[in-house]
């Protein structure tokens, strides 16, 4: 079987990621904002006796650019570690796309032009004379639709023919293809004239996108609409997620009781019920909320709305020292900090990139969501829970803006750069791809629950049960004394004075420390530490009830505020260190976020006390 290595190249928003999904059935992220493919990604497919390895390179407008994505693409193409270049173009916006195509031709490699979104071009009355394009660019042209999978088999056939044919260097149809000004202006003129020959509009261009934009990015209505959509997302995240949560919680409680009642060895029964089931179950409990949140974010991305919000918030972000493009990493941070940190590569200015890296942590990631849902469900009525959840996320964003202003005035001074960003057309989401985006997130969440969090739960259970107490543990007070004398209890009592001003007990203090590894571990830790009271008080036989009974509301407020701001998980911290480039920035992140969290939590504690008195 022969192997063909394909470099998939194109400008942002031309559908490269969608194409690689269609060709290789790869579950890759697809979005409508610049830089969705931050790193080189690959997938494989097989056709006839050939194995195709498709390298999805970051979207780039030019090979002359200096952003991280453009550097990655240029470096890969200059390495010659591929057989064929497949240049993907947007058939509805061909003229702009051809500039990159001309630059790619100057590499003098085997290249094929794939005109994507031809189905949309036909709907808009756009006709393309591909014979002229093929002749002028001395390359094969294939009209395809990654969305409907039209002509994808033909594309593979053309790639095979190109791969098997002997490469004949092209005659230079235009000399200064990759030169800079003033020749670059001549290239633009050439592309413009060529486009007039290739492109024919049979009817007026549809202006549906403009009509929608007139409302969604309106000067007065745009921001309220965005806030309403965010409120609706968090409202649905809590209210819809609550329905399966009750069944999942009941199932794990029943399973734990079954294990305790049917395993005679109390040591093994406790390890399984109080360690694994209580710890892992407490994390899996919030899977529905996680899936609903990621579904909402995926829909906003794939429809093209997120790019509009970046434009809408540019003025506000600039006032706080952030760049308009910072919005993309920031909104990604609501899902997970790891891809959010990586998405800062779209920012060319180093100061803007570093500032955005620091502020991302204030955007509550999906791993923090279970903590919020747990505490909101414990202390507030369910009909208002969505409002409180929305308020927590908005408060985190506001604190992030304040932190950005502070850092811009101190550590990251510099001039603002202008904001230029492409506005893609609105598109109906591809439900198959949206599902796989959500499925992948859920799969990662469950994988973490079944590996890392399972081990953490066992470790926490062991540390909270040893050394063994000689007392009769049928008494609740004896159980409390036993856990306080355990290794975990001794550690918790040791760090308790640090968190005493926040009025957090040693159990919450230990939960915060465990959250440095992964925020989900906090839920697992509380699930183990607070599970002792289950057998004693039957009216509070779930984690929410136990927390509501044992933690005062002001302390709960302080805990939530601390969780909202302090250092990201270990995996995200490693990525932050890599993206920032220096260890000193990682140390500063830890000190800055933990100090900010402590101050905000202290203020929140006393405000809550005043309001409750």
Curated annotation (Swiss-Prot):
GTP 2 binds at residues 35-39. It comes from the Bacteria. Induction: Detected in iron-restricted, mid-log-phase cells, part of the feoA-feoB operon (strain NCTC 11168). It is a multi-pass membrane protein. The chain crosses the membrane at residues 220-240, 266-288, 290-312, 322-342, 357-377, 387-407, 444-464, 510-530, 556-576, 587-607. Changing residue 500 to K: In strain: F38011 and M129. SUPFAM superfamilies: P-loop containing nucleoside triphosphate hydrolases. GTP binds at residues 116-119, 145-147. Belongs to the TRAFAC class TrmE-Era-EngA-EngB-Septin-like GTPase superfamily. FeoB GTPase (TC 9.A.8) family. Fe(2+) ion uptake in diverse strains of C.jejuni is much lower than in E.coli and H.pylori. Site-directed mutations in FeoB cause no defect in Fe(2+) uptake. This is Fe(2+) transporter FeoB.
């Amino acid at each position: 079987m022969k192997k063909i290595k394909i470099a998939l190249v194109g400008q942002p928003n031309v559908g490269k990621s969608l194409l690689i999904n269609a060709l290789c059935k790869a579950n890759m992220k697809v979005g409508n904002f610049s830089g969705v493919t931050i790193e080189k990604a690959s997938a494989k497919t097989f056709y006839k006796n050939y194995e195709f390895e498709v390298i999805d390179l970051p979207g780039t407008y030019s090979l002359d650019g200096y952003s991280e994505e453009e550097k990655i693409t240029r470096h890969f193409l200059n390495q010659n570690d591929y057989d064929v270049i497949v240049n993907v173009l947007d058939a509805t916006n061909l003229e702009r796309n051809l500039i990159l195509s001309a630059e790619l031709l100057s590499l003098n490699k085997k290249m094929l032009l794939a005109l994507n979104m031809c189905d949309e071009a036909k709907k808009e009355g756009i006709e393309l004379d591909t014979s002229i394009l093929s002749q002028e660019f001395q390359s094969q042209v294939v009209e395809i639709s990654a969305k409907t999978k039209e002509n994808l088999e033909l594309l593979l056939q053309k790639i095979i023919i190109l791969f098997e044919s002997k490469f004949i260097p092209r005659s230079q149809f235009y000399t200064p293809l990759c030169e800079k000004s003033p020749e670059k202006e001549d290239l633009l003129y050439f592309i413009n004239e060529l486009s007039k020959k290739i492109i024919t509009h049979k009817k007026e261009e549809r202006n549906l996108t403009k009509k929608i934009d007139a409302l969604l990015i309106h000067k007065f209505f745009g921001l309220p609409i965005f806030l309403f959509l965010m409120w609706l997302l968090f409202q649905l995240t809590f209210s819809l997620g609550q329905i399966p949560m009750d069944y999942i919680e009941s199932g794990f409680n029943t399973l734990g009781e079954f294990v305790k009642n049917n395993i005679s060895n109390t040591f093994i029964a406790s390890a399984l019920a109080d360690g694994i089931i209580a710890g892992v179950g407490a994390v899996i409990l919030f899977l529905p909320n996680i899936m609903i949140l990621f579904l909402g974010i995926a829909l906003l991305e794939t429809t093209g709305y997120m790019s509009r919000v970046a434009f809408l918030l540019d003025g506000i972000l600039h006032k706080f020292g952030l760049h308009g493009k910072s919005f993309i990493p920031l909104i990604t941070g609501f899902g997970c900090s790891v891809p959010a940190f990586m998405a800062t590569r779209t920012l060319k200015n180093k100061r803007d990139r570093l500032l955005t890296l620091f502020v991302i942590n204030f955007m509550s990631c999906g791993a923090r969501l279970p903590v919020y849902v747990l505490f909101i469900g414990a202390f507030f009525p369910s009909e208002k829970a969505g409002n409180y959840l929305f308020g927590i996320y908005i408060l985190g964003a506001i604190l992030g803006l304040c932190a950005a202003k502070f850092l811009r005035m101190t550590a990251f001074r510099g001039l603002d750069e202008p904001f230029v960003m492409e506005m893609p057309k609105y598109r109906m989401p591809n439900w198959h791809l949206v599902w796989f985006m959500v499925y992948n997130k859920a799969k990662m969440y469950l994988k973490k629950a079944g590996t890392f969090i399972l081990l953490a739960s066992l470790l926490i259970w062991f540390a909270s049960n040893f050394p063994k107490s000689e007392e009769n543990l049928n008494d609740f007070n004896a159980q409390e004394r036993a856990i306080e004398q355990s290794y975990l209890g001794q550690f918790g009592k040791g760090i308790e004075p640090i968190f005493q001003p926040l009025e957090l007990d040693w159990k919450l203090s230990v939960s915060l420390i465990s959250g440095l590894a992964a925020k989900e571990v906090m839920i697992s830790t509380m699930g183990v530490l607070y599970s002792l009271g289950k057998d004693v008080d039957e009216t509070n036989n779930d984690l929410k009830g136990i927390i509501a009974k044992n933690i005062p509301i002001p302390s709960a407020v302080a805990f939530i505020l601390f969780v909202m701001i302090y250092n990201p998980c270990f995996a995200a911290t490693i990525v932050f260190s890599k993206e920032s480039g220096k260890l000193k920035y990682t140390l500063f992140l830890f000190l800055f976020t933990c100090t900010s969290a402590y101050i905000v939590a202290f203020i929140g504690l006393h405000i809550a006390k005043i309001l409750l008195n």
